[in-house]
Amino acid sequence: MAQNQNHNEDRDFLDDLIDIQDSLQVLSNPLDALMGSLSIDPNTDKPFEPMDFKEIPWSNANRCLRCASGKAEACSRCLDVCPANCIDIHNQSVRIDDEACLQCGLCVAACPTETFNTRRHTSRMLYDQVARAASAYEQCYITCTRALARKPEGNEICLPCVGMLSADIWFSILTDFDNVSVYLPLGVCDRCRTTTGEEAYTQAIATAEEWTGATVGLEVD
């Protein structure tokens, strides 16, 4: 138990380092940061900030199968996939602990009735984002903030976690495009505190590949 606890603490520590590394670089030379802010367009040259790609979901208990049926066995997908155990379903309510939430978006993808939603990551918005890049470039890459660790290029879709793309979204992507790959360096998921993300995206992709007969490319370098 102590070994697992230490391993989880290592994950948290590494994630925190990645989330704040760019902020620390700015703080180390505040004069340069100030001069830069006066001479450049902040919208185009803003430093990479992982939190810009993340968002705490909101919930609608009226859509929840578990709340509607009053039975715990009706559905537990969000509870099973949440890496922070920050979702509570009780007395016809669905609550997210904002302080514990990792903003990974896995609950959004897992819920079959769209109980969870975010402003920037609706199913339609996610598909459209991929479609624009796949239509405009020879190759499109879907990745996460930890794997990319920089501002995405035009053909790169940066998500909180690749696991926030549901099987339905992958089905639509594979039906319409054959130039979409996942970019995740070897071992990047092993060091992530979103511990359920790798299983989530592999299952979603495998399901969509079975439905379509197409395959998703994987880039690890």
What feature does the model see in each segment?
Residues P160, M164-L165, I169-T212, V216:
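Cofactor-cradling patches in redox/metallo enzymes
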Residues A131-Y137, K151-G154, L174-D176:
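Flexible, charged surface loops at secondary-structure boundaries
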Residues E99, H121-Q139:
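ABC transporter nucleotide-binding domain
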Residues K71-R95, L106-R124:
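Iron-sulfur cluster-binding cysteine motifs and their immediate structural context
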Residues M1-V81, N85, Y137-A149, D221:
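Ferredoxin-type iron-sulfur electron-transfer modules and their immediate structural context
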Residues E153-C161:
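Active-site regions of enzymes building and remodeling cell-envelope glycoconjugates
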Residues A109, T115-F116, Y141-E153:
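Short, charged N-terminal beta->alpha structural module
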